[in-house]
UniProtKB/Swiss-Prot annotation:
Cross-referenced CDD domains: DEXDc_FANCM, FANCM_ID, SF2_C_FANCM_Hef
A Gene Ontology term for the protein's cellular component: nucleus
Family classification: Belongs to the DEAD box helicase family. DEAH subfamily. FANCM sub-subfamily.
Protein name: ATP-dependent DNA helicase mph1
UniProt-listed GO biological process terms: double-strand break repair via synthesis-dependent strand annealing; interstrand cross-link repair
Length: 1101
C-alpha cells in the first residue's frame, strides 16, 4: 500500500482514535537518514506477499517502511521524535485512561473479550499467507475479538441490537483512508471500521461504567429486581448534545417495581398498622399517571431519598404520596413537612390537602407566631405538621415535641441543608433519640459544587438519589417549553459620564495603594468589595504590612475601608441604574456632615469631580420620566408588550381579577426593586406591580413579615397584582401557574439561584424567560453558572463522585413485608375544602408554657459512673456486715388514772395476799428507802433491756454529791447562817438592785447612766429578790444617800465561805428532806408529759 503526500496530510488530520498508526524503530531510523527533510515522501508499506490492507501492528513491526523521494514539497513538517518508542498493543479489561506524558505516543488500547470463548469463525483462505507463522494468526484473531467485544459492549449500552458474531456473513472491514485495495487480497475481517462509533473506545467512566462481559456473551441477561417496559432503540442525549451511552436506570421510561431493602435491624418502636402494610397507595386524582413520579415515590418509601427534579414537575405530589402511605402504615407516629418560609409552608398544605386526602383535623401548621403553650397542645393531638425548621428546632430542644414519635421528615428546598442551617440541626437531633425515621429531601438544584452536594448527602443521611434533567426521557413530555432570551446592553452616555467623574474621584486613593504595593489594580471602576478585602489581607500578611508602623497601617486600613464602601456603589451604577447609585452616594455624603467621617471620606466628598457628579445626578433623579439604565427601558417595553399581547386590560368590566397572566421580575438589591416598581407604576392599571422582599429591615427599606408576604402572594394569585418585583425571597418554591414571563434584571453567578429563578415559569403552560445582562462580567457570570449547572447535573446522575449512606437509611417495615402498589382515587374529606390554613386559633389568654422536658435516648446508661468503671477494670466491693435490725418503737397512749388504780376488791386482795404475812413475828412492808444501802444507791446498777431513766440518773448524782460532803459540814453551815444583823440592809439593797440593767440597743459601748457603780462593792453574781417583794413591787425602793454611804463606811467583816445573802440571825433555815426535793422535781415535768406519747418505758418512776 502506498500513500501519497496529500493522503499523508489527511492521514494525520484524522483523530488518533479512528485509525491505527503503526510505528517501529526501523521507521524512525529511515526517517532520520532521509537527506531531504523539507520534502514530503510517499509512504510505501511493502511486504513479501500481499495480504490484508491493515494487519496487526506486531506483524508490521518486522517490515521496514520505505520512503521514496518525491520532488513535490509538502506544506507540513514531519515530527521526528528524539526518543525511540515502540508502539505496542495494550489489552485491558476496562477502558481506563492511565496518566501518560503528552510527548510520548503510546500504542492502541484494546478491550479484552469476555471469559467465555467466542463462537468459532468460519475459516477463510488467505492468499499468499503460507510463509507467515501461526503466531501472527493468533494475534490477529485476538485483535479481532477485542474489536468485536468493544462494539458489542457499546451497542448494549445504547440499547441497540447486538450484531451476531456467529453468523457466517460478516461485513468486510475497510481502511479509514480511502484507497483501492490491491488485487488478490481477501477482505475477510468480520467488522468494518466505519461501523465503529467515534467514542467506542472512550474511557470516561462517569458516562459509561464498565459492565460485566458475561452479560454480553451469555445471551439473555439475568432479570434484575425491577422490571421495565423501556422502549428499545432510543438514544438519549446529554445536556451537551452528546450521546448518553449509559442512561441512568432511574431515567428509564416505564414503571418499575422496588422492594424494601433486606436489612438486619431491630424492630421499630412505632406502632404499625399491619392491615395496611401489604399495599401502598398511589393517588390518581390528578389524572394520568406519570412514570417518574410513580418510581420516585416508590423508592422514597423505602430509602432516605434526595429528589432533584426541574421546577414544576410535581415534587409536592411525590411528597404527598409518601406522607399518605406512612400515615396509613403507622397508628400514632407523626409526619413533619418543613419549608424555609411561611408562604412555602402554606403552599404545600393546600397541595397536600387536595392530593393525599389526609384529614384536616389531623393536620396543623406551626410557625413562630404561635405561643409555645398552644404548640404543646398541638403536638399532643395532631399527627401531620407543616412548619418552618426554626420552630421545629425550638420545640425539639424545649421538649415540646417528642423526637421518638417522628417517622417521616420531608425537607423542601434541601439545597439549604449545609453548615449550621436548621435542617441540619433537626436531623442531628432526631438521630440522637430516634433510629427509625425516614428522610425525603426535595430540591430543584442540589448544589453548585461536588462538596456542597456531598454535604447535603452527609447531613441528611441520604441513601439514594433520584435526579432528572429537562432532557430526561421520562419527563420530556411533561416539560413545558421555555424560551430563553438573552439581551445584552452597553453603558449609556449618562453612565459613561458618571463613571468618568467617579474614576477621577477615586483615582488618588487607588494610586496611593498601588505605590504601597497594597493593591495592583489601576482602574477604579474594577473595584469590588471582595477583591479589596483579599488585597488587605494579603498586604497585612506580607513583610511590608507586618513591619509597617502603626500610622502606615492605619492609613492603609482607612483607604481600604472607604474604597470597599464605594465598591457597592460601582456595582449599582454598572448593573442596576443611576438612581440607586445616587442614593448610595447621598448616604455616603451624609456620613461626613459636621465632624463625622474620616480623613479620606471627607477627601472624596470635597473632591471637585465628586461635586460635579452630584450636580449631574440631582436633576436627573428628580425628573419622574428619567430612566437611569438601559435595562429599565427594555424591561418596561417587554412588560408592556407581554400584557398587551395577552389582552390585559381589555375586559369590558375592567375587573382586575380577570388577569390571566403574571410576570415575575427578579433583582438582587432592594434599591433596584424599588426603582423597577417606580418605573412600572407609570403604566397603571395595565401594570400593577408590587415589591416582594424579606423580613429583615435595611437602611431606607422596611422588611416584610411572613404574614405580609403571604398576603402579597395570595393577592398575586388572585390578580390584584399582576407583576411582582422580588429579591431572593421569591426565588424558591413559589408555585404560581399563571406566571408566563420571568425577567432576570441581573445575573447571578450561582447556578442554584439562576435555575430557581427560571423555574418560576413554565409550570402549567409554556413560559418565557428574559435575561438582561451587561456586556462583560455579568454576561460571563451567566455563562459560568449555566455550564456549572450542566456539569453538576451530569456528575450527580452518574453517582461516581459521591458517597451515599445506606447504613443510615433504616427499613422500618417488618422483614418479609413487600407492599404492592395500589392505584386508586383518593376520597378528599369535606373538611379539606376549607380555604383557610389549619393554624391553631389564637386565644385571649394562651396556655402557659409547659416545663422543659428532657427525652432519654434508647439504651442509655442512667445514673452516675465512676472513673474506675470507665477503664473497664472491675473492682470488688468490700463486704459490709449486715446491720442488726432494731425494732421500731411504737407509740403507746398513756391510760387514764381510773384505769390503772386498783378497785376496792383488788385492794383487799392485795392487802390479804401480799401485805399480810402470817407468822409469829410482825412484818412490815414500807416504801423504798434512799438511805438504805448507800453505796449501792450511789452506783448505777447493771441493766439489760430497760435502761435507767433520767430521774434515776439525777438521783444517783445527788447521792454521790452528798457522799462527798465532809463530817464538819454542820459547823461550817452554822457560821454561814449566823450573819450579822447589820448586813441585812446591804443584802436588801443588793437584792433590789437600784441600778437596773441597761437595755441593749444593739450598739456596743453605749452608756446608759451618768455614773458608774462603785468598784469597791462589786455586784454579786447570784442576787435574788424576795418572793413577796418580787411579785407586788416591780419598782425598786429608793434608799437615802446617807444610809447608803453609812453601809459602805462600816468596817468590813470577812464572810465565811458558802454564805447566803438570805440568811439572818433571827431564824434558822429548815432545809427540806430528799423526798420533798424529788417530789418538786417531778412536779415540774408533769405538765410537759401530759400531752406526750411515751416512746419507750425506760423510767424508774
Amino acid at each position: 500500500m502506498s500513500v501519497s503526500g496529500d493522503d499523508f496530510d489527511d492521514y494525520f488530520d484524522d483523530e488518533i482514535d479512528d485509525v491505527i498508526v503503526p510505528g517501529t524503530s526501523d521507521t524512525v531510523e529511515s526517517v532520520q537518514t532521509n537527506n531531504r527533510p523539507a520534502k514530503q515522501s510517499d509512504i510505501s508499506i511493502s511486504q513479501g506477499n500481499e495480504e490484508d490492507e491493515f494487519q496487526s501492528p506486531d506483524r508490521l513491526s518486522g517490515n521496514a517502511v520505505q520512503f521514496e523521494d518525491v520532488e513535490r514539497t509538502s506544506k507540513y513538517n514531519v515530527f521526528i521524535p528524539k526518543c525511540k518508542n515502540v508502539q505496542e498493543n495494550i489489552f485491558v479489561t476496562q477502558l481506563t485512561q492511565p496518566p501518560s506524558p503528552p510527548e510520548m505516543i503510546r500504542g492502541p488500547r484494546w478491550k479484552k473479550p469476555g471469559p467465555e470463548p467466542l463462537a468459532p469463525e468460519p475459516a477463510t483462505t488467505r492468499v499468499g499467507a503460507n510463509h507467515q507463522s501461526d503466531q501472527y494468526h493468533d494475534e490477529d484473531k485476538e485483535m479481532e475479538a477485542a474489536i468485536a467485544a468493544s462494539l458489542r459492549s457499546f451497542e448494549e449500552e445504547n440499547g441497540g441490537d447486538v450484531p451476531s458474531t456467529a453468523s457466517g456473513s460478516t461485513p468486510a472491514r475497510t481502511a479509514a483512508a480511502p484507497c483501492a485495495a490491491p488485487k488478490g487480497t481477501a477482505a475477510d475481517v468480520p467488522f468494518d471500521l466505519d461501523d465503529i462509533p467515534d467514542d467506542a473506545f472512550d474511557s470516561d467512566l462517569s458516562l459509561s461504567p464498565p459492565r460485566s462481559t458475561s452479560q454480553a456473551t451469555r445471551g439473555p441477561p439475568v432479570q434484575s429486581q425491577f422490571r421495565t417496559n423501556r422502549p428499545l432503540g432510543l438514544r438519549q442525549s446529554t445536556l451537551f448534545d452528546m450521546a448518553a451511552r449509559n442512561p441512568d436506570i432511574s431515567s428509564q421510561r416505564g414503571e418499575q417495581i422496588f422492594s424494601p431493602p433486606e436489612k438486619s435491624e431491630p424492630p421499630t418502636h412505632h406502632k404499625l398498622n399491619e392491615e395496611a402494610l401489604n399495599t401502598w397507595v398511589y393517588p390518581t386524582n390528578l389524572g394520568k399517571t406519570r412514570d417518574y413520579q410513580f418510581n420516585i415515590a416508590q423508592r422514597g418509601l423505602f430509602h432516605n431519598l434526595l429528589v432533584a427534579l426541574p421546577t414544576g414537575l410535581g415534587k409536592t405530589f411525590i411528597a404527598a404520596t409518601i406522607m399518605l402511605n406512612w400515615y396509613r402504615w403507622t397508628k400514632s407516629a407523626q409526619i413533619i413537612f418543613v419549608a424555609p418560609t411561611k408562604p412555602l409552608v402554606a403552599q404545600q398544605i393546600s397541595a397536600c390537602f387536595q392530593v393525599a386526602g389526609i384529614p384536616r383535623s389531623e393536620t396543623t401548621m406551626l410557625t413562630g407566631e404561635a405561643a409555645p403553650g398552644i404548640r404543646a397542645e398541638e403536638w399532643k393531638s395532631k399527627r401531620v405538621f407543616f412548619m418552618t425548621p426554626q420552630t421545629l428546632v425550638n420545640d425539639l430542644k424545649s421538649g415540646i415535641a417528642d423526637p421518638k414519635r417522628i417517622v417521616l421528615l420531608v425537607v423542601d428546598e434541601a439545597h439549604r441543608a449545609t453548615g449550621g442551617y436548621a435542617y441540619v440541626e433537626v436531623v442531628k437531633f432526631l438521630k440522637r433519640y430516634n433510629k427509625s425515621f425516614r428522610v425525603l429531601a426535595l430540591t430543584a438544584t442540589p448544589g453548585s459544587t461536588v462538596e456542597s452536594v456531598q454535604a447535603i448527602i452527609d447531613d441528611l443521611g441520604i441513601a439514594k438519589v433520584e435526579i432528572r434533567t429537562e432532557q430526561s426521557l421520562d419527563i420530556r413530555e411533561y416539560v413545558h417549553a421555555r424560551d430563553t432570551e438573552v439581551q445584552t446592553f452597553q453603558n449609556s452616555d449618562e453612565m459613561v459620564l458618571c463613571m468618568e467623574l467617579f474614576t477621577r474621584t477615586l483615582q488618588p486613593l487607588v494610586d496611593q495603594l498601588r505605590n504601597l504595593n497594597a493593591y495592583w489594580g489601576r482602574d477604579p471602576m474594577a473595584l469590588t468589595a471582595f477583591g479589596l478585602t483579599k488585597a488587605r489581607q494579603q498586604w497585612m500578611g506580607s513583610d511590608a504590612g507586618r513591619n509597617a508602623n502603626l500610622a502606615l497601617k492605619g492609613k492603609v486600613n482607612a483607604i481600604f475601608t472607604v474604597l470597599a464602601s464605594l465598591a457597592h456603589a460601582i456595582d449599582l451604577l454598572k448593573y442596576h441604574g443611576i438612581t440607586p447609585f445616587y442614593r448610595h452616594l447621598l448616604h455616603f455624603q451624609s456620613n461626613t456632615d459636621g465632624q463625622k467621617g474620616g480623613k479620606y471620606q471627607r477627601q472624596i466628598v470635597q473632591d471637585e469631580s465628586f461635586k460635579k457628579l452630584m450636580n449631574h445626578l440631582q436633576p436627573w433623579t428628580k425628573n419622574p420620566d428619567f430612566i437611569g439604565h438601559p435595562k429599565l427601558e427594555y424591561l418596561k417595553q417587554v412588560v408592556l408588550n407581554h400584557f398587551m399581547d395577552r389582552g390585559e386590560g381589555t375586559a369590558a368590566n375592567g375587573d382586575q381579577s380577570q388577569s390571566a397572566t403574571r410576570i415575575m421580575i427578579f433583582v438582587h438589591f432592594r434599591d433596584s426593586a424599588e426603582e423597577v416598581v417606580r418605573v412600572l407604576k407609570r403604566h397603571e392599571p395595565l401594570i400593577r406591580p408590587h415589591v416582594f422582599v424579606g423580613q429583615s429591615s435595611a437602611k431606607g427599606s422596611e422588611g416584610m413579615d411572613q404574614k405580609t408576604q403571604l398576603s402579597i402572594v395570595q393577592k398575586f394569585k388572585k390578580g390584584t397584582y399582576n407583576t411582582i418585583v422580588a429579591t431572593s425571597i421569591g426565588e424558591e418554591g413559589l408555585d404560581i401557574g399563571e406566571v408566563d414571563l420571568i425577567v432576570c434584571y441581573d445575573s447571578s453567578a450561582s447556578p442554584i439561584r439562576m435555575l430557581q429563578r427560571m423555574g418560576r415559569t413554565g409550570r402549567k403552560r409554556a413560559g418565557n424567560i428574559v435575561l438582561l445582562l451587561m456586556q462583560g462580567k455579568e454576561e460571563e457570570s451567566y455563562i459560568k453558572a449555566k455550564d456549572n449547572y450542566e456539569k453538576m447535573q451530569q456528575m450527580i446522575a452518574s453517582g461516581t463522585r459521591f458517597t451515599f449512606h445506606d447504613d443510615k437509611s433504616p427499613r422500618i417495615l417488618p422483614p418479609g413485608v413487600r407492599p404492592v402498589a395500589e392505584k386508586r382515587q383518593i376520597d378528599i374529606p369535606v373538611e379539606n375544602t376549607q380555604a383557610d390554613l389549619p393554624e391553631p386559633r389564637r386565644r385571649a389568654r394562651p396556655p402557659k408554657r409547659p416545663p422543659k422536658k428532657f427525652h432519654m435516648p434508647d439504651d442509655v446508661e442512667t445514673g452516675f459512673a465512676k472513673a474506675s468503671s470507665l477503664t473497664g477494670k472491675v473492682t470488688k466491693k468490700a463486704e459490709t456486715k449486715r446491720a442488726v435490725r432494731k425494732p421500731t418503737p411504737e407509740p403507746v397512749e398513756v391510760p387514764a388514772l381510773e384505769e390503772v388504780l386498783l378497785t376496792p376488791r383488788q385492794q383487799q386482795d392485795l392487802e390479804r395476799r401480799y401485805c399480810h404475812i402470817a407468822g409469829t413475828s410482825p412484818e412490815f412492808i414500807r416504801n423504798p428507802r434512799v438511805d438504805a444501802y448507800p453505796r449501792l444507791q450511789s452506783v448505777p446498777r447493771p441493766t439489760k433491756a430497760v435502761k435507767h431513766g433520767s430521774l434515776t440518773s439525777r438521783m444517783i448524782g445527788t447521792l454521790q454529791k452528798m457522799g462527798k460532803v465532809s463530817v464538819d459540814c454542820e459547823s461550817r453551815y452554822r457560821k454561814v447562817l449566823a450573819l450579822d444583823s447589820s448586813k441585812e440592809i446591804v443584802d436588801s439593797v443588793l437584792s433590789r438592785d437600784p441600778w437596773p440593767p441597761a437595755k441593749n440597743s444593739g450598739r456596743l459601748g453605749e452608756k446608759t447612766h451618768a455614773f458608774k457603780r462603785p468598784s469597791a462593792t462589786p455586784r454579786p453574781n447570784n442576787v435574788h429578790v424576795r418572793e413577796d417583794e418580787n411579785e407586788d413591787n416591780c419598782t425598786p425602793e429608793l434608799v437615802s444617800p446617807e444610809k447608803l454611804m453609812s453601809s459602805f463606811l462600816e468596817p468590813h467583816t470577812e464572810r465565811p465561805p458558802y454564805s447566803s445573802q438570805r440568811s439572818q440571825d433571827a431564824f434558822e433555815l429548815d432545809f427540806p428532806d430528799v423526798e420533798t426535793l424529788l417530789n418538786r422535781s417531778a412536779e415540774r415535768h408533769v405538765s410537759r408529759k401530759r400531752n406526750r406519747f411515751v416512746l419507750d418505758d425506760d423510767s424508774d418512776e
